Amino acid sequence: ERGTVVIKRPGRMRWLYTAPERKEFVSDGVTIYAYFPADKQVMVSPAPTGADTTPALFLTGQANLVRDFTAAALDIPGAAAGLLGLKLVAKQPDPDFEWLAVGVDPVNYQIRHLVALDRQGGRSTFVFTDLKENQRPPDTLFAFRIPKGVDVITNAR
């Protein structure tokens, strides 16, 4: 899959997938909206809280590496050569994730590669390119308006 992600601390994210099909994930820090235009469906869930250790909290700076994770050096298969790899296991077991693997650029410490293994054995891999930091996106970018004519599924978590 291919797309863009914009992250703003604390807890705000917008993931826009453009290929192979469009889908959108938006968090305003309180609620997460997962929009699937082809299915005419929006899933609405509470955003993770400080008690969680999801990849989202890690990326938005809400998780604390030392407090929340046990870290170990790791070679990440498929990651670009030269990245520093860390395997992160939550100190408090997360109901959804086994571990995260992070590939960090040793020059500027940007996260370039992220792998999340869920409790069902599913693996999600993200490769970040063309990173731009300190862009100060407007808060309105993280507001989601539910389109007319879609089914809304609410998850209590």
Predicted feature residues:
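An acidic-aromatic
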Residues: 4-55, 124
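A conserved hydrophobic position in a structured secondary element of the catalytic/binding core
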Residues: 27, 61, 104
